[in-house]
């Protein structure tokens, strides 16, 4: 079985590592952790490198620990932040912790010999007193050492509260606690976490004379220079209530050709040979974008499940051609209804309305006059068939699965009517 570095380095997933990590991994599997700040009730794609590092750790025989920062979340990590985060209530944090754990279950197994574990650092941070903390942790760090950390230096001009200044000591205590309680010898995180990670290794070394290790992965930007995971609509979330599975799929499908090889290495478990084969296929026929399609299918299936992914793919085919509308199931049309303009009518209303009325109702036409002109130019369709007259009505037998009717204007403008 390959060790963690042997798995991650060829995929360019390692930015930095502490001395001696390779030698330690050569001795056998290791227990490692990643911390997640529970400032929201969902992870987003910007967290996925951390999640994948835990998944690879488990695949390499190690034991992953997910530390949800219920305690540190009440303080706030200054790393990479221009201003202080709002402090969350205990109830908000507990609710977010439960939601994040559920999402992580799609990436790591919580069963078996090296089952993943979830820990909330509030469980040990809430019980430690200030005097005890200063005695057992604070005395091992000089202020000069703490000021030298990039996470602090970047905030000196704008101002940093003592609360955030002390964050690195609290995270260091997390590492020390996990080393003692669970024999955890590795902390992983983004490259902006290097200072916090090394502070933890320093604390273990000074208090116990033991060696523990750190590993960081790169902060990811796209070829266009933008921060990965950000769109015009904001962050791309794993929670389907925040980012629909359809939009999630489209995010990956729209990956720039210059980024797709790297993202396949980062966010899938495909072998390097499989990735090379996809890229070779793409070079032969770039228009089909097989690499982006495989990336989108793989990540969406892992986050939302294979059934939802199949529905999303079928919904995409409806909008971009290549599928039989009559074969589309209710689940597929339900996906579409969440992504394109939609309206609901009763059976009696359907019997009274013409197709022109429906086109106006869903916003595909401003008036019946526009419908007449569009029909003359063969510019409207109903359920994939060119509309011959705006005065026609939709018969119950013409409805698609689930009582849907799909209206189309031109090549790219769609709307759904659902009969209830």
Curated annotation (Swiss-Prot):
The GO molecular function terms of this record are: ATP binding; RNA binding; tyrosine-tRNA ligase activity
Cellular component terms (Gene Ontology):
cytosol
Q: Which CDD domains match?
A: TyrRS_core
Q: Name one GO biological process term.
A: tyrosyl-tRNA aminoacylation
- What keywords tag this UniProt record? Aminoacyl-tRNA synthetase, ATP-binding, Cytoplasm, Ligase, Nucleotide-binding, Protein biosynthesis, RNA-binding
Query: Its principal location?
Result: cytoplasm
**Could you tell me where this protein is found in the cell?**
Cytoplasm
Which residues are ATP-binding?
230
Q: Where is motif 'KMSKS' region found? A: 227-231
The record's SUPFAM superfamilies line, in alphabetical order, gives:
Alpha-L RNA-binding motif, Nucleotidylyl transferase
**InterPro entries assigned to the protein according to its UniProt record, in alphabetical order:** aa-tRNA-synth_I_CS, aa-tRNA-synth_Ic, Rossmann-like_a/b/a_fold, S4_RNA-bd_sf, SYY-like_C, Tyr-tRNA-ligase, Tyr-tRNA-ligase_bac-type, Tyr-tRNA-ligase_bac_1
Which Pfam family, giving just one, matches this sequence? Answer: SYY_C-terminal
Keyword Iron in the entry? The reply is no
Record: residues binding L-tyrosine: 33, 167, 171
Residues in S4 RNA-binding domain copies: 353-419
Question: What Enzyme Commission number(s) appear in the record?
Answer: 6.1.1.1
Reactions it catalyzes: tRNA(Tyr) + L-tyrosine + ATP = L-tyrosyl-tRNA(Tyr) + AMP + diphosphate + H(+)
Positions occupied by motif 'HIGH' region: 38-47
Keyword field contains Ribosomal protein: no
Function of the protein: Catalyzes the attachment of tyrosine to tRNA(Tyr) in a two-step reaction: tyrosine is first activated by ATP to form Tyr-AMP and then transferred to the acceptor end of tRNA(Tyr).
- Protein family membership: Belongs to the class-I aminoacyl-tRNA synthetase family. TyrS type 1 subfamily.
Assembly and binders:
Homodimer.
Name of the protein this chain belongs to: Tyrosine--tRNA ligase
Look up and give the organism this protein is from: Anaeromyxobacter dehalogenans (strain 2CP-C)
Ranked from the top, the taxonomy reads: Bacteria, Pseudomonadati, Myxococcota, Myxococcia, Myxococcales
Q: Which gene encodes it?
A: tyrS
